């Protein structure tokens, strides 16, 4: 029973960490990353379709993304979707390829993005701590129902705390990597 609670807590903490990584990967650094365009939706015959389903996105160099559209008739729609996104990008098309140059980030914008990364990280830590709280409540319920002893409860709560500490440390590592990436020119 306790092992199931620990396993569930670990799985939920891993999901929280993955969600944090997903949120942080969308924050633009000065470097070209294909994942930057993941959130863009293109109007494809009246339906909003993810760009990834309509085109291949690769980093051409450190400051340019190349978007190769599978269907020539969609080039204008893809270009418009990139232009109207809130990423501040200005695409230009050449044949079936759309080049998206990334403007360099200003120092002030880097600081703003760093604050955003820290806020996302704090939300990630809160999510991990909420998982810990839920697991501890389940363990206390087992003690109350006399399914486990107090010693087993203490041991289980210590294990959950160690798990929480390790995931908070992983969140800090992800944040440090992203902040370093943001501040590198």
Swiss-Prot record:
Keywords for this protein: Cytoplasm, Protein biosynthesis
Q: Which GO terms describe its biological process?
A: cytoplasmic translational termination
Cellular component GO terms held in the UniProt record: cytosol
A Pfam family (short name) is RRF
Tell me which positions the record assigns to the signal sequence. none
Q: What SUPFAM superfamilies does this protein's entry cite?
A: Ribosome recycling factor, RRF
Cite the GO molecular-function annotations of the record.
ribosomal large subunit binding
Q: Where in the cell is it found?
A: Cytoplasm
The protein's matches in InterPro entries, at most eight in alphabetical order, are given as: Ribosome_recyc_fac (IPR002661), Ribosome_recyc_fac_dom (IPR023584), RRF_sf (IPR036191)
The answer on whether this UniProt entry bears the keyword Nuclease reads no
Q: Has keyword Cell cycle? A: no
Question: Which HAMAP family does this entry report, sorted A to Z?
Answer: RRF
Matching NCBIfam families: frr
Of which family is this protein a member? Belongs to the RRF family.
**Its biological function?**
Responsible for the release of ribosomes from messenger RNA at the termination of protein biosynthesis. May increase the efficiency of translation by recycling ribosomes from one round of translation to another.
Name-wise, this protein is Ribosome-recycling factor
User: From what organism does this protein derive?
Assistant: Actinobacillus succinogenes (strain ATCC 55618 / DSM 22257 / CCUG 43843 / 130Z)
The protein's gene is named frr
């Amino acid at each position: 029973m306790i092992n199931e609670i620990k396993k569930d807590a670990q799985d939920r903490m891993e999901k929280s960490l993955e969600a944090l990584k997903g949120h942080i990967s969308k924050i633009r650094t000065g470097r070209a990353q294909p994942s930057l365009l993941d959130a863009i939706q293109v109007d494809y015959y009246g339906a909003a379709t993810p760009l990834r389903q309509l085109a291949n996105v690769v980093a051409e160099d450190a400051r340019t993304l190349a978007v190769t559209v599978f269907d020539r008739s969609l080039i204008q729609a893809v270009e418009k979707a990139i232009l109207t996104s809130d990423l501040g990008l200005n695409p230009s098309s050449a044949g079936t390829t759309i080049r998206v140059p990334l403007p360099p980030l200003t120092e002030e914008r880097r600081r703003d993005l760093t604050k955003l990364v820290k806020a996302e990280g704090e939300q990630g830590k809160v999510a991990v701590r909420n998982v810990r709280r839920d697991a501890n409540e389940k363990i206390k319920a087992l003690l109350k129902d006399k399914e486990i002893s107090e010693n087993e409860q203490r041991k289980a709560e210590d294990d959950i705390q160690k798990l929480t500490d390790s995931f908070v440390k992983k969140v800090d590592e992800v944040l440090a990597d992203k902040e370093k990436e943001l501040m590198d020119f």
